[in-house]
């Protein structure tokens, strides 16, 4: 069943799932007054969850850009909705169980809050904001089969050299996990490099920092802008996942993505419950050192502090074995 999203104030949130009947009823209702909707046969235009999410997130980003950077780069208010539509509707075609439009949306929202805090703490331009948000939107698009030039029905581009890999029969997009960072960088270069306001190389450099295992040791004060952007994107990726209020109940989806590439055996996960059991240790050992700069920026605003609270709440629940949702333990 697809997820249902709602907008409350200036936030976009997941509010559970819609049934097929609810989705059908929603698709049959007009959206707004006086809107022109194309018809397919006797029915109204089909409305999809990726489409609705892209529209809502794009509008939110455009409004925020206009409000915070009104004196510069007005064209960015049109660019970000375009980028949201392009990336989210592509990711909406993915069959990966965890790395879906909701994950990308959450990473983008926490990335927004990180940059808002950064803008209050130090000089941040409209270009800084827009290119960082586009890196959030595109950081996992490499999971999707068919989005990179050179992809074929049975062979997919694996790296920047153009090398291709064939996936086992029955594979989902999750099987491209070992290659998704390079594929995401290729997508950005192929699709966005010609857009005047976009620095595709800058976005690709930031996406490289999401490659796991991490090779860059974070510094408390990152003076180099490229390094700081990369570290903040890495943090947004981690906080968007681990600070998700519904993270625990997504452990099953994450487990079976890991299973597809043999990562569970490497990590020692026998069941989805192991992801929850080992989450506190993973957080304090592997995650906390990577996100301190982002935490500093998030702590500047109330919405940023909510992400910190969500993150620590999930750690607390796993440590105290609060079994309110998620895999049976």
State each model region's role.
Residues 147-170:
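Post-HEXXH active-site segment of zinc metalloproteases
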Residues 5-20, 24, 30-82, 86-96, ...:
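Non-catalytic interface/linker regions that flank or bridge core catalytic/transmembrane domains
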Residues 107-108, 177-193:
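An active-site-proximal "capping" alpha-helix that borders the catalytic cofactor pocket
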Residues 126-137, 168-176:
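Hydrophobic/aromatic-rich structural module bridging two neighboring secondary-structure elements via a short loop
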Residues 93-131:
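Alpha-helical phosphate/pyrophosphate-handling elements in metalloenzyme active cores
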Residues 83-90, 132-136, 203-211, 232-236:
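Short alpha-helical scaffolding segments that buttress acidic/His motifs in well-ordered protein cores
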Residues 82-109, 166-174:
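Active-site flanking loop/helix segments enriched in acidic
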Residues 34, 38-67, 113-128, 138, ...:
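Divalent metal-dependent phosphate-bond-processing catalytic cores, especially two-metal-ion Mg2+/Mn2+ enzymes
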């Amino acid at each position: 069943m697809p997820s249902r999203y709602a907008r409350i104030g200036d936030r976009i949130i997941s509010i559970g799932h819609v049934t097929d009947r609810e989705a059908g009823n929603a698709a049959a209702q007009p959206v707004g007054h006086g809107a022109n909707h194309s018809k397919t046969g006797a029915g109204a235009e089909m409305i999809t969850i990726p489409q609705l999410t892209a529209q809502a997130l794009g509008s939110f980003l455009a409004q925020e850009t206009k409000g915070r950077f009104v004196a510069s780069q007005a064209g960015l208010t049109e660019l970000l909705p375009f980028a949201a539509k392009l990336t989210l509707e592509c990711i909406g075609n993915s069959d990966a169980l965890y790395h879906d439009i909701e994950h990308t949306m959450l990473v983008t929202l926490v990335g927004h809050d990180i940059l808002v805090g950064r803008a209050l703490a130090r000089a941040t331009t409209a270009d800084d904001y827009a290119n960082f948000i586009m890196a959030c939107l595109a950081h996992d698009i490499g999971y999707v089969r068919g989005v990179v030039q050179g992809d074929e029905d049975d062979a997919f581009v694996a790296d920047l050299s153009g090398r291709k890999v064939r996936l086992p029969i029955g594979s989902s997009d999750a099987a491209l996990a070992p290659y998704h960072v390079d594929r995401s960088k290729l997508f950005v270069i192929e699709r966005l490099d010609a857009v005047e306001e976009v620095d595709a190389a800058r976005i690709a450099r930031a996406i490289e920092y999401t490659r796991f295992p991490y090779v860059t040791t974070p510094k408390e004060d990152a003076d180099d802008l490229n390094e700081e952007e990369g570290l903040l994107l890495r943090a947004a990726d981690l906080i968007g996942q681990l600070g998700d209020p519904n993270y625990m109940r997504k452990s099953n989806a994450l487990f079976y993505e890991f299973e597809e590439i043999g990562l569970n055996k490497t990590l020692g996960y026998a069941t989805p419950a192991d992801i929850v059991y080992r989450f506190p240790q993973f957080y304090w050992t592997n995650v906390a050192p990577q996100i301190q700069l982002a935490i500093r920026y998030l702590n500047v605003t109330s919405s940023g502090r909510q992400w910190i609270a969500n993150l620590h709440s999930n750690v607390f629940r796993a440590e105290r074995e609060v079994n309110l949702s998620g895999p049976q333990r």
